[in-house]
C-alpha cells in the first residue's frame, strides 16, 4: 500500500516517523535546531519547556548567536525512547512562543 502525501506537499505523520526511524537510532539522542530572537525570555521559555518535556531524561542546549547578535541558534539534543517521542517533543518545542525556524 502506498502512502499518499497531503496535497500541500507536506509529509504525513507516518511518513515523518518512517524517515526518523530510518535515520536515527532509538532509544538515543535526537537533535533539534531552533532559531529565535536573542532574548532572555525565549531562553527561559525554552529551558522550562525542555525541563517539562524531558523530565528525568537528559538534554543539552548549545547556543550560537548570529553575526549581528539579533538571532540565536539553539542546538538541542534530547534523549528519547522512540521516533514517536522524538516527533512529539519536536512538535511541542516548535509551539514555544518565539520560535522562528525549526530544523
Predicted regions and their residues:
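Long, contiguous binding/interaction regions
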Residues: 1-73, 79-103
